[in-house]
Amino acid sequence: MSYVPIVIEQTSRGERAYDIYSRLLKERIIFVCSTVEDHMANLIVAQLLFLEAENPKKDVYMYINSPGGVVTAGLAIYDTMQYIKPKVATLCIGQACSMGSLLLCGGTQGMRYSLPHSRIMIHQPSGGYKGQATDIEIHAQETLKIKRLLNELYSKHTGQELKHIEKSMERDNFMSPEEAKKFGIIDNIISSRDVMTMSAK
């Protein structure tokens, strides 16, 4: 089990201990920092809903360092980002690959960022199945449906033509922040928090 740092704060009632992610949540920061899978997605969704309930008019900041993962888990996070009332600023720290890149570009328009040396990668969904031929065919058709859905979402958020998205996602497509900005996945490349704060206003 990986170690999670504990932060100690002094309050009027004495010391209060938080794990580092809970402390970041107090600042309305959600950290997507691992493979996207069901348990992690449920935690992210819960945090988004909590921050909306706490203050529906105050922005949420989602920091992303993820290699991607399960499509349905990623779509649960994505849909919740679109569902809640607060604006969601996204920031790539390290990498935003596969479903991580969809979450990055699914942030509020004008509030999608990357640090200077991050990497962004898009590609088509993959899947491996075994069993009866009919079941394999059903799963293959479902994968194609998901591929079309993801292409449409990237097209919506990047402003790129659907045909260009389809071509760009045929293979692993790695981008620098500059290339991701040109593609429409992010809006700005930032090197300090002050720049992020000013550009969000």
Swiss-Prot record:
Q: Which InterPro entries match?
A: ClpP, ClpP/crotonase-like_dom_sf, ClpP/TepA, ClpP_His_AS, ClpP_Ser_AS
Catalytic EC class: hydrolase
UniProt GO MF annotations: ATP-dependent peptidase activity; ATPase binding; serine-type endopeptidase activity
Which example biological process does GO assign this protein? protein quality control for misfolded or incompletely synthesized proteins
Q: Enumerate the UniProt keywords alphabetically.
A: Cytoplasm, Hydrolase, Protease, Serine protease
What is the active site of this protein? Answer: S98, H123
Identify the EC number(s).
3.4.21.92
Keyword check for Cell inner membrane: no
TM region positions: none
Has UniProt tagged this entry with the keyword Protease? Answer: yes
One GO cellular component this record assigns the protein to is: endopeptidase Clp complex
Tell me what reaction this enzyme catalyses. Hydrolysis of proteins to small peptides in the presence of ATP and magnesium. alpha-casein is the usual test substrate. In the absence of ATP, only oligopeptides shorter than five residues are hydrolyzed (such as succinyl-Leu-Tyr-|-NHMec, and Leu-Tyr-Leu-|-Tyr-Trp, in which cleavage of the -Tyr-|-Leu- and -Tyr-|-Trp bonds also occurs)
Q: How does it assemble?
A: Fourteen ClpP subunits assemble into 2 heptameric rings which stack back to back to give a disk-like structure with a central cavity, resembling the structure of eukaryotic proteasomes.
Q: What does this protein do?
A: Cleaves peptides in various proteins in a process that requires ATP hydrolysis. Has a chymotrypsin-like activity. Plays a major role in the degradation of misfolded proteins.
- Assigned protein family: Belongs to the peptidase S14 family.
Q: What is this protein called?
A: ATP-dependent Clp protease proteolytic subunit
Species of the source: Rickettsia akari (strain Hartford)
By which gene is this protein encoded? clpP
